[in-house]
Amino acid sequence: MGLGFSSKKQLPAYCGPLPVGSLVLELSVPEEFRCEYKTIEHKLRTVKVRIFYPLDPTKDVEPRTDELWLPFHEGIPEVAKGFRWWLLRAFASGLTNLALPVYKGELFHPPNNGKLPVFIFSHGLVGSRNVYSSLCGTIASYGIVVLAMEHRDNSAIISTVRDPLHPEEPPYVVQYREISDFYADATVVLQNERLLFRQQEIQIALQMIRNINDLGTPDENLPFLCSVDSSFYNSVFQSMKGNLNTAQGELIVAGHSFGAATCAFISGSSTKSLYNDYMFHTEFKCSILYDIWMLPVRQLHLSTMRYPTLMIISYEFRRFVDNFQALESWLVNKDSENQNAGESADEKMSVVPLKKYSHVFVYDGTVHANQSDLPILLPRMVLRVLKGKFEADPYEALRINTRSSVQFLRENHVENVQGDNDPSSLQTNIIPGWERIM
């Protein structure tokens, strides 16, 4: 089709031990939680997530082709201008029928009546619920239910809002909003309000998955939309009822770039839960930060993580001097409430009183986009135009990212993670190019 594009691009099969199912869920937000901010172009009306869930490999599973990576019925961003965006549009037209490698089947149930862990993922700027599908789907293939958020704070590349509470109203598109000056005072206000907006979305998504676990439905009173028909989603939600670990202090929060900064914001937040009489940050057991963008962390003076945290840094971001120096300073902050003057360097990485340690790893040859599907799907020529020059094999980068992420969960006692114990994935200089740097 010209320009070196291929219409046969495929996403890799998820490499964990279990097949994976998926659906998109959009839930109306209760009126009292429909927050709005001056810097964000619309009120929070719905919350939209892609849910990845593990399936039982001993039962029949059928491949599906209906969960599309680039749903064209939602459009290509109208805001896109200039050669770089034109190139992306042209390439995207070759992905019209690209489907996620997911299946229809029965939910996996851990042995001994165990419950499935729940993992919430927040995307970065110009991301979406689908852009990190290989990462999120592979995490799910280890027996974890993953909620991939689609944020409506003008940070997603494009998002369509369909409010099922008002079906008579036409859907509308939330466009990506460029930041013209990252260091302006107005940008600090924007970053803060975006993070508050994202936190609200994550709170509502968390309550939604709790409702599924407790009631077998996302909400008993509010309507919702799904990417599958009612017989399909009712079967999925009923199978999840009573089988998810949604207890306070047992959830995992993760994100890429601005999504990783979102995790830091939640960790340091003094916001109460919308639905419970405790602080929202106490919902989480541990965190995984992929290429955290430190500018909003520094601008908003966010404290170090309260939870055991794995950080995976791309080679590109390690060479991003301002960001990496800010990360080093943040992690060894001597004023952190859980650190003492006599601590060793490794102990200064501990951000909880129980001496559970964080890890910071880098994989040689990777770029900022390596946490996403883009290096797999975009030709090298396109990434070169977009200034994404990578040397690492994108499939191998995905494998080591997910192996280390899953092993980190095992080592922090997240129960019922499937697959073999893999301690080498959190050791330095055993896997070529994989190095612990702090």
Swiss-Prot record:
An example GO biological process term is: phospholipid catabolic process
Protein name stated in the entry: Putative phospholipase A2
Cellular localisation: Cytoplasm; Nucleus
The UniProt family comment states: Belongs to the serine esterase family.
From the record, give the cysteines joined by S-S bonds: none
Major location (coarse): cytoplasm
Q: Which organism is it from?
A: Schizosaccharomyces pombe (strain 972 / ATCC 24843) (Fission yeast)
Tell me which UniProt keywords the record has, alphabetically. Cytoplasm, Hydrolase, Lipid degradation, Lipid metabolism, Nucleus
